[in-house]
């Protein structure tokens, strides 16, 4: 299997590669959505 791609901790990020290699979120925001969905954005409208 793909090393890391199947890891729930990184959620294979947004591009299909382990985001953990560049710092988990690294400002990408892709992995952040997986563990922390943008609730304030939808509830603020």
UniProtKB/Swiss-Prot annotation:
InterPro entries: Natr_peptide, Natr_peptide_CS, Natriuretic_peptide_brain
Chief location of this protein within or outside the cell: secreted
GO molecular function: hormone activity; toxin activity
Biological process, per Gene Ontology: regulation of blood pressure; vasodilation
Organ and tissue specificity: Expressed by the venom gland.
SMART domains (alphabetical): NAT_PEP (SM00183)
Subcellular locations according to the entry: Secreted
Keywords: Disulfide bond, Hypotensive agent, Secreted, Toxin, Vasoactive, Vasodilator
Top-level lineage group: Eukaryota
Record-annotated membrane-spanning stretches: none
Functional summary from the UniProt entry: Snake venom natriuretic peptide that targets both NPR1 and NPR2. Exhibits hypotensive and vasodepressor activities.
UniProt protein name: Natriuretic peptide OsNP-d
The species this protein was found in: Oxyuranus scutellatus scutellatus (Australian taipan)
Taxon lineage: Eukaryota, Metazoa, Chordata, Craniata, Vertebrata
């Amino acid at each position: 299997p793909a090393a890391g791609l199947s890891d729930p901790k990184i959620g294979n990020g947004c591009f299909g590669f382990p985001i953990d290699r560049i710092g988990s979120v690294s400002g990408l925001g892709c992995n952040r959505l997986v563990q922390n969905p943008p609730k304030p954005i939808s509830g603020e409208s």
